[in-house]
Regions:
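PAPS-dependent sulfotransferase catalytic core
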Residues: 1-91, 139-141, 243
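PAPS-dependent sulfotransferases, especially Golgi type II membrane carbohydrate sulfotransferases
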Residues: 1-25, 158-169, 173-193, 203-279
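Hydrophobic/aromatic beta-strand patches that form the interior of the parallel beta-sheet core
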Residues: 25, 49, 119-121, 192-194
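PAPS/PAP-binding and catalytic site of the sulfotransferase fold
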Residues: 34-47, 111-115, 193-218
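Short catalytic/ligand-binding loop motif for oxyanion handling, primarily in non-cytosolic enzymes
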Residues: 36-39, 58-60, 105-108, 128-133, ...
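Glycine-rich phosphate-binding loop used to anchor ATP phosphates in small-molecule kinases
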Residues: 88-110
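Conserved phosphate-donor/acceptor-positioning beta-strand/loop module used by diverse small-molecule
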Residues: 114-136
Length: 279
């Protein structure tokens, strides 16, 4: 592959080689699972170009993508238009493009078909902790572009009968089962599952992640510094509009009454067991 300083100098052969041989890494999740933390961690290697939610974010199209998996050509065109130039830029700079945008989750098959050597990380978090974090952010209560596009049950009657906890528990299970099945169809060299708790808790999972991405493991002290501080904490603006329903006081999962915890267990128990989580 020729070397170019600028993207607008890239020739057709370079573009074709990028699609076929370059290996961007897409970190897919439910959201509220450490996707911003993982970007800060990976950017410790200067060769990495890791992004959390670059624009276009595609937040309005998550639910549509989840319901139209059979329209692979349409999904592929959408993701090509949204990401081709970013990936090509990183490619000609000889950097490792990594994106941890939750909104790409249901575009995963399109990404795999478009970028033939792309790698995928399934990032997971305990279902109870996910529900708490998402509820505090107002997920499935806000009236916003994000909520308009968030994945939901196709059965509107059943969906309208569910409360916020039930909806978020359903979302955790639906998304993680989808990603589990997607990764299972990939060669082992192109897939990795990471639990947020393991990435926060020591060096082994972090080293496995860096190795998988083709990045160099940074100094232990730098890793520990990021592991030890909050990333992407909830912020409620003083002039927050009333269509936003954030709730910073939503209680931690361990403090829930048994009946509320059972809602999460009913929706998530089988998938949680597969991922070594206890409910």
């Amino acid at each position: 592959m020729k070397k170019f300083r600028m993207i607008h100098h890239a020739d057709r052969a370079t573009i074709a080689a990028m699609y076929e041989h370059y290996a961007p890494v897409f970190i897919l999740s439910t959201g509220r699972a450490g996707s911003k933390f993982i970007v800060e961690l990976l950017n410790l290697d200067a060769r990495v170009l890791a992004c959390h939610e670059p624009r276009p974010t595609l937040e309005y199209f998550c639910d549509w993508a989840s319901r139209h998996q059979e329209q692979g050509d349409v999904l592929g065109r959408m993701i090509d238009a949204a990401r081709m130039e970013m990936v090509l830029e990183a490619c000609i700079q000889e950097r490792i493009f990594i994106e941890s945008n939750q909104c790409l989750t249901f575009f995963a098959p399109a990404l795999a078909a478009l970028f033939k050597s792309a790698k995928f990380v399934h990032l997971v978090r305990h279902p109870g902790d996910f529900v708490v974090s998402a509820a505090r952010k107002g997920w499935h209560r806000n009236d916003s572009i994000w909520e308009a596009g968030r994945a939901r049950l196709a059965d509107e009657r059943r969906w309208s009968a569910m409360d916020q906890v039930e909806r978020l528990a359903w979302l955790w299970d639906f998304t993680n089962r989808y990603l589990r099945d997607f990764l299972a169809a990939l060669p082992a060299a192109r897939r990795l599952t990471c639990r947020l708790e393991d990435l926060l808790g020591g060096e082994r999972a972090v080293m496995e992640l860096f190795t998988f991405c083709g990045a160099d493991m940074p100094e232990a002290g730098k890793v520990t510094a990021i592991q030890g501080r909050p990333v992407n904490t909830l912020w409620v603006d003083a002039d927050e509009p009333d269509n936003m329903k954030k709730n910073p006081a939503f209680p931690a999962f361990k403090d829930w009454p048994a009946g509320e915890r059972e809602k999460v267990a009913r929706a998530c128990a089988a998938t949680a067991r597969e991922l070594d989580y206890e409910l």
